[in-house]
Amino acid sequence: MTSKVNKIYWDSTAFICFLKRMEGERRKICEDILYHARDGNVNLYTSTFTITEVIRPQTVDVAGTRLISPEEIADIQGMFEWPWVKKIDLDQRVARKAVELERDYGLSTADSIHAASAVVAKVDVLQHWERKDEFGKISRLVAVEQPRMLTYRAVAQMPNSAHNRLFRTAAAMVGQQHLRLRSRP
């Protein structure tokens, strides 16, 4: 059973939480939403700008001081090629809306791009894991929340075997961690 939310926008923090094993519960919630997107129960959107934000922090947060390799970058970029993650191009229309939101609501440039992408795509909700609530400023334009489980009575702890069978289209490598992304049974 899924929520009545059909169109979800993720900013970069949701993807980063999905990639990091240490995120625990947040990561499980992101996996649940990705399952629902993969299975066609919800439509998941993000900006093409998200790709740069997701890969850039990995150089410090996950991989230590070394730069991530071109192969690691390609593996992470593969996540953004999943057909169930719909990309919103940072085009003239989104850029104009971002400028307006930055001016009117005092959002950072990055947050204004995400907010503008969500507004232009007419999503039901913009989801993010940020500690600050910058997106709350635009809640009259689009609903804003932290990602949440969509599966009714979702288990609090996914068995290891469930994670090993996760998703079918890519293998994302973050630093020394390998996340196998395959279909679940």
Regions found by a protein language model. Name each.
Residues M1-K7, H36, A115-P185:
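Acidic, PIN/NYN-like endoribonuclease modules and their adjacent C-terminal/linker elements
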Residues S12, T48, Q92, A110-A115:
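Conserved glycosyltransferase catalytic-site signature
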Residues A74-M79, K86:
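Extended, non-globular alpha-helical segments
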Residues R96-E100, D104:
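Internal catalytic-core helix/loop-beta-alpha segment
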Residues K7-W10, K28-G64, W82, K86-L90:
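PIN/NYN-family metal-dependent endoribonuclease catalytic core
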Residues H36-A37, M79, L101, L141:
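Hydrophobic helix-cap positions at the C-terminus of alpha-helices
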Residues F15-R27, F49-E72, E100:
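A short secondary-structure junction motif
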